[in-house]
Every structure is written in structure tokens, then in C-alpha cells.
């Protein structure tokens, strides 16, 4: 299969809150493909009807859309309908991983470790009892929308009286909110490429947690790869991440976020099925430590498209 003879659509931009990030990722991917002689073209679904890709001579899609409409199974379903192979996870894994609550429930059913949480919806918000939540989960707490990516709508709650307003804020972004125990240990993210678990990255944000600013804007967020884990811990983490990836039916590539609790136990947090591919991005950083260049990584992801 010579992919250089194919016409490739790089899907970027889109309509989610992460449109700008997707543009940055998409430009980097496009550049890498063009540099290596691929017939690649930028396609923004906000401006172009993706249902016409096949009719317009495209043979395959590199999907680097982030968030809703690109990473949640809808675009994957559309590409399946028109019979166009695409990179990354299929419909089910994409839809499921976009929903943090259901992802965690599935992991829990598989016996995998996740943070303790309380789910609040727009309908149940009026019944929220902050005292009871704090009694169960302790303080501080993390409040986040179940469906929004890129750390949008997150709040760290340090006092019981802050809980309601944090949930109200998160409800601006989604109808389902997670209130979770605060995980005080290391923050790690672990890429998986073609069933191979790549080295973990340890994230040390300047602020209290890895929010939108730390993720995309700040140059003061520190990333360590290798993560400084012992070989045994790295191995334990890799096995856990692979089990988490397989439980959800992921394929091609994904990045799984993991936190440690105060005792150092791993807790699965969430999955990015279309991880960022910008200069700040973590997947390429990890791949580089095992000798995979950005260009090689882009081609490998493309070759894994189904």
C-alpha cells in the first residue's frame, strides 16, 4: 500500500471549543506529510462538507480534530458511512472516551483504579448536599464537566462553601458534572502507539493543576520524560495503561492521563483519542525519547488508519 499515491485529507479546525488547538496540530501534521512527499490537503469541517471527501477524490483522512464533532464518534461515523479510512479510534471508543463519567464507570467495571467521584447533573443540582459530598470525598475537590476537553470548566474546590458555585460554573459547559477526590500525587500522561506503550511523561504545572493555560499557553509548565519512575513502576504503569486502552476498544493511537494519589497509587483519569500534535504537545515528546521523530510519528499514525 503506497500512501504517497493517495490523496489525504488532514481534518483540522472544526467547531469545538478546541478549534484553535486543532489548527495548530493540523498545521504541524500537514507540514510533516508535505515534507515527506505525501499528497495532503487541509480540510476544515466548518468550511467544507466532509461527506464530499470521497467524491472529491480523497482516499483517506488524518483526523486531527479535537473535542466535540471531531473526537466524539460523530466524524468517525460520517467517515465510516462514506467508506473513507481514517486515523485513530473508531466510533465507539471515540464516543465513549469523550464522556469522562462513562469512561470511568467502564474502567471501574474492569477492576481498574479510578478516583472516587460524585456525579451531578443539571436536573440533580438542586439536591446537591455539599456537606455530604465533602464528608465522602474530603477536601480539596476537583470539579469538571464530563464532556469538555482541554481542561475547560475545571475548578479546584478548597472549602465546602465553594462547591456549589464550582458546579454551577462547570454546568455552563456540560449537563453532567464530576466532583472528584483530589489526587495529590504526580500527574502523568502515557501515549500508546499501535498497541505499544510509549514512555510516560510527568507534568509539573506552575499553578495548582494542569489547566487550559498550562496546557497550551504557559512556558512554565515542566514536562519530564522519562518521568523519573523506577523501572518496576514504569512497567506497572504501562500494563495498567494498556489494559485501560484495550478496555475501551481504542486503536491506532491515544494518550491516557493518570494521576497518583497521596500514597502513590495510580488512578486512571481520561483518554485523548486525538492527542495534540503541536510544538508543546506531549505525544511527540514521548515518541522522541524512543527515537521516533515527529515526521516518523505522523507517518506511523497515518499507516495505522483503517
From Swiss-Prot:
Residues engaged in binding Mg(2+) 2: 270, 272
EC number: 6.3.2.4
UniProt keyword Chaperone, yes or no: no
One Pfam family of this chain: Dala_Dala_lig_N
Subcellular location: Cytoplasm
GO molecular function per UniProt: ATP binding; D-alanine-D-alanine ligase activity; metal ion binding
Residues where ATP binds: 134-189
Pathway annotation from the record: Cell wall biogenesis; peptidoglycan biosynthesis
Sorted UniProt keywords: ATP-binding, Cell shape, Cell wall biogenesis/degradation, Cytoplasm, Ligase, Magnesium, Manganese, Metal-binding, Nucleotide-binding, Peptidoglycan synthesis
Disulfide feature: none
Similarity annotation: Belongs to the D-alanine--D-alanine ligase family.
PANTHER family, alphabetized: D-ALANINE--D-ALANINE LIGASE, D-ALANINE--D-ALANINE LIGASE B
Protein name: D-alanine--D-alanine ligase
Origin species: Haemophilus influenzae (strain 86-028NP)
Lineage of producing organism: Bacteria, Pseudomonadati, Pseudomonadota, Gammaproteobacteria, Pasteurellales
Amino acid at each position: 500500500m503506497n500512501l504517497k499515491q493517495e490523496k489525504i485529507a488532514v481534518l483540522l479546525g472544526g467547531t469545538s471549543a478546541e478549534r484553535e488547538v486543532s489548527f495548530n496540530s493540523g498545521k504541524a501534521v500537514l507540514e510533516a506529510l508535505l515534507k515527506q512527499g505525501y499528497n495532503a490537503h487541509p480540510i476544515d469541517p466548518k468550511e467544507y462538507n466532509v461527506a464530499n471527501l470521497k467524491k472529491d477524490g480523497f482516499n483517506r483522512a488524518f483526523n486531527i480534530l479535537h473535542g466535540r464533532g471531531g473526537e466524539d464518534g460523530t466524524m468517525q461515523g460520517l467517515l465510516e458511512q462514506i467508506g473513507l479510512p481514517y486515523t485513530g479510534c473508531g466510533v465507539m471508543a471515540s464516543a465513549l472516551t469523550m464522556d469522562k463519567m462513562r469512561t470511568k464507570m467502564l474502567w471501574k467495571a474492569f477492576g481498574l483504579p479510578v478516583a472516587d467521584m460524585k456525579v451531578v447533573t443539571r436536573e440533580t443540582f438542586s439536591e446537591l448536599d455539599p456537606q455530604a459530598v465533602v464528608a465522602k470525598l474530603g477536601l480539596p475537590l476537583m470539579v469538571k464537566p464530563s464532556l469538555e476537553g482541554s481542561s475547560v470548566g475545571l475548578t479546584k474546590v478548597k472549602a465546602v462553601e465553594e462547591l456549589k458555585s464550582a458546579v454551577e460554573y462547570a454546568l455552563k459547559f456540560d449537563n453532567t458534572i464530576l466532583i472528584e477526590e483530589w489526587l495529590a500525587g504526580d500527574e502523568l500522561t502515557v501515549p500508546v502507539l499501535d498497541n505499544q506503550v510509549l514512555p510516560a511523561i510527568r507534568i509539573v504545572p506552575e499553578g495548582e493543576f494542569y489547566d487550559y493555560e498550562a496546557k497550551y499557553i504557559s512556558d512554565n509548565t515542566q514536562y519530564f520524560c522519562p518521568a523519573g519512575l523506577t523501572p518496576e513502576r514504569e512497567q506497572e504503569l504501562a500494563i495498567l495503561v494498556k489494559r485501560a486502552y484495550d478496555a475501551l476498544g481504542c486503536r491506532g493511537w491515544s494518550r491516557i492521563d493518570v494521576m497518583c494519589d497521596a500514597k502513590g497509587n495510580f488512578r486512571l483519569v481520561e483518554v485523548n483519542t486525538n492527542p495534540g500534535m503541536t510544538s508543546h504537545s506531549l505525544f511527540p515528546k514521548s515518541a522522541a525519547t524512543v527515537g521516533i521523530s515527529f515526521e516518523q510519528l505522523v507517518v506511523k499514525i497515518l499507516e495505522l488508519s483503517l
